[in-house]
Amino acid sequence: MSVRKLKPITPGQRFRVVNGYDAITTDKPEKSLLAPIKKSGGRNSQGKMTMRYKGGGHKKRYRVIDFKRDKQGIPATVASIEYDPNRTAFIALLNYQDGEKRYIIAQNGLQVDQNVVSSNEAATPEIGNAMPLANIPLGTVISCIELRPGQGAVMARSAGAFAQLLAREGKYATIKLPSGEIRRVLALCMATIGAVSNSDHQLMIGGKAGRSRWLGIRPRTRPVAMNPVDHPMGGGEGRASGGHPRSRKGLPAKGFKTRSRTKASNKYIVERRKTRKKK
């Protein structure tokens, strides 16, 4: 994978860094795995705005992704690596031996014509293979992890993300998540071998406001520029600092822990994620 820094022939391209898309093998998606997406503009079923700064954006079609990897024991061949406008990671089209086609999240290093398999039994821990945590060797880099058996992958799915299997004890496996959190999950949960593709996504620079509009992101108003009725940090004479950083609902921002101390799943967290150091 690579990135491209554009020549500064316009102000919008001066600082722009785009993906080289070297890993992409086709620009035509599988039509049978496409579904329509209706834009909401941040409004609910009553037409009321429930999420600010959303609206517009390029028209897209959803790619139906197989997060469960429940087609057990049937080998599949990687037909193509494709771009997905709905996520940061690339996706891979699999052709199963029984004729079915499915999309999965592509792992880093997954190649066209490579064979992958999903199995509840012990399988070869190669990139792209999916199996329960109980059958994965300790220390393996994994991604697309289930939180509950049969739920489908919910953790480590974005571009470049990966977790690591640290230990197994009884019916639980201990994994280190991308956030740094160390957590126990049931060993029956499925995971995929390898890190998620498109690890260079973090190097992308939009270069201009228009790219955010292409993505459906509208301009964000600074809280200190609002009135007191609209935000706790609004108001004041002239250019006020806004006081202590607060959210729109008045909760402290920048480092305040919002997770409930009595949440039932706290017992599965061995070590909480590290807070980022202020620069």
Swiss-Prot record:
Biased composition (Basic residues): 245-264
Keywords: Ribonucleoprotein, Ribosomal protein, RNA-binding, rRNA-binding
A UniProt-annotated Pfam family: Ribosomal_L2
Region (Disordered): 223-279
GO CC aspect terms: large ribosomal subunit
InterPro entries for this protein: NA-bd_OB-fold, Rib_uL2_dom2, Ribosomal_uL2, Ribosomal_uL2_bac/org-type, Ribosomal_uL2_C, Ribosomal_uL2_dom3, Ribosomal_uL2_RNA-bd_dom, Translation_prot_SH3-like_sf
SMART domains: Ribosomal_L2, Ribosomal_L2_C
MF term (GO), any: transferase activity
Keyword set includes Ribosomal protein: yes
Signal peptide interval: none
Cysteine disulfide partners in this protein: none
Domain of life: Bacteria
Gene Ontology BP annotations: cytoplasmic translation
Family: Belongs to the universal ribosomal protein uL2 family.
Function: One of the primary rRNA binding proteins. Required for association of the 30S and 50S subunits to form the 70S ribosome, for tRNA binding and peptide bond formation. It has been suggested to have peptidyltransferase activity; this is somewhat controversial. Makes several contacts with the 16S rRNA in the 70S ribosome.
Assembly and interaction partners: Part of the 50S ribosomal subunit. Forms a bridge to the 30S subunit in the 70S ribosome.
PANTHER family, per the entry: LARGE RIBOSOMAL SUBUNIT PROTEIN UL2M, RIBOSOMAL PROTEIN L2
Protein name (Swiss-Prot/TrEMBL): Large ribosomal subunit protein uL2
Organism, scientific name: Christiangramia forsetii (strain DSM 17595 / CGMCC 1.15422 / KT0803) (Gramella forsetii)
